[in-house]
């Protein structure tokens, strides 16, 4: 719906001028009150760069908004961070791969007579 369309560069201004909290932003974006429309770039034609946006309010609450599958997806952002592609939820899952990292050597683990040493 072009009547709800904003360029990727205009989207942050719309957020800042229309809403007072991340809850208001969430409701508007999830209801489809806005869509990101392609911008014509010389030599590229109409494109909508997959910008990712971070939104904070005065309470410290934060959201990430990113294009996924042609729609804007909203994520709660407890870490207060922003990522590029792949999607924010992928990065949150990937972060769990590093939770158990430790700067100290891990002692070998013995299981049924076999000893397993940590890599690295």
Language model segments and positions:
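Alpha/propeptide regions of enzymes that mature by internal proteolysis
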Residues: 8-33
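A contiguous strand-loop segment
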Residues: 1-2, 36-39
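Short, structured surface segments that line ligand/substrate-binding pockets
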Residues: 46, 52-58
């Amino acid at each position: 719906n072009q009547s709800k369309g904003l360029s990727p560069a205009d989207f942050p201004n719309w957020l800042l001028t229309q809403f007072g909290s991340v809850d208001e932003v969430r409701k508007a974006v999830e209801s489809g009150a806005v869509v990101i429309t392609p911008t014509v770039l010389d030599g590229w034609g109409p494109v909508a760069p997959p910008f990712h946006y971070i939104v904070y309010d005065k309470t410290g609450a934060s959201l990430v908004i990113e294009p996924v599958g042609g729609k804007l997806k909203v994520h709660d952002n407890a870490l207060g961070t922003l990522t590029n592609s792949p999607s924010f939820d992928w990065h949150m899952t990937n972060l769990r791969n590093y939770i158990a990292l430790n700067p100290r050597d891990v002692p070998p683990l013995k299981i049924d007579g076999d000893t397993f040493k940590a890599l690295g």
